[in-house]
Amino acid sequence: MRKIRDIIYTILLILVILLVYRNIDTISEFFTDLLVSNEKVTIKEANNFKRKYNYVNFNYNINYIPYTKDDIINIYFNVLNNGWKEFAFYCPKEYKTCMDDVETVGNDNTLMSNINNYVSPFNSFENIKTTISSTREIKINVTPKYDDEMIKVLDNKVNKVITELNVQELSNREKIEKVHDYILSNTVYDSESDNLDTTSAYGSLILGHAVCSGYSDAMALFLDKFNIPNLKISSANHVWNLVYLDNNWLHLDLTLLGMT
């Protein structure tokens, strides 16, 4: 009798194993749903350098639950624009290719660089890393281009220069001209230095030496203070500013004059 019972148990065990094997994806998805259902996206306050310009390329009003690749791109934009150093969201069950699309977007260096050009220099990244979990959790970790001390020093410098230039009552065009002349008068174009700060506004406004990205970051900080819509344009070896002035987008390249 015991032998028969053992045989039955063995047969049942084999049947259970076969059932699990044949339905492993469904079972895995079930437990994944249990884990994800208990998770909520945490939305923190944006920092003081969030841009609120109405860029047509990106959507500010999102709920951080993606259903398309464009939704994923907008999440990356808002994470950077808000100045968040880390953020987690989840791929919904209905969006079957979500994790693949996240991987595609997160690994697209050209796209990430383009998004970087639309946010304040203070919210731009030096490095951005995406981690994809089997529970459909997506983590974004941002290493900022500017640390907190550099931001403090530069923000104080920009405020001081604005006061010294006495531009409060000037038109936007006149403000830009004043800042343009100030940066060119106080920055030397330096492509020979090994100092990485030459690629930043710190190099231009504090050290007095910069390359194109340093010039453009410096100008962008002033434009943001004046609430003048702007972004950066970048190619493989050059960066300059694009400024919205008098209902037109205008190119502003300080480096061309800085090099002369």
Predicted regions and their residues:
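A short, highly charged nucleic-acid-interacting micro-segment common to nuclease
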Residues: 201-214
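Hydrophobic/aromatic-rich core segments of domains that either
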Residues: 214-260
